[in-house]
């Protein structure tokens, strides 16, 4: 009886491993549909994504999905895996999913006409906002997406927008409500 329980556990683990490998293969194929494979071959992207997964402890499928999302949001293929690495760091420090970190960073980059290489500085700004206010980067990522394009259009830089969120939330205004106030003011 003990052997059959152990066999069942081994079979379940094997099945889960096969599923993860299949999901990762699908995610890499998806990256290949948007990547500039002339600048970075798919094999190199795959190797870099696996390396980032190992370094960060995040699943390879999650890294591949985030890479697809980053490239789809206009991050150059050559910069995508590094950008995702920065996004993983923001996700860990800001209490959010990697996909949400990619989303908020690409929203800022696209709205302000910045580069993927600015992701580290932008992550620092978001973490500083979290530290100075009563908010998390997760809450900011859900609220800022509606405000960033307007702020950019009206010449309000990301530093001032972030400081506004920090000040409002520090004074007891919920992050979502702060976004509504800022959007109305703009």
Protein language model regions, located:
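Small-residue helix-packing and pore-constriction motifs in hydrophobic alpha-helices
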Residues: 2-55, 65-73, 80-94, 100-132, ...
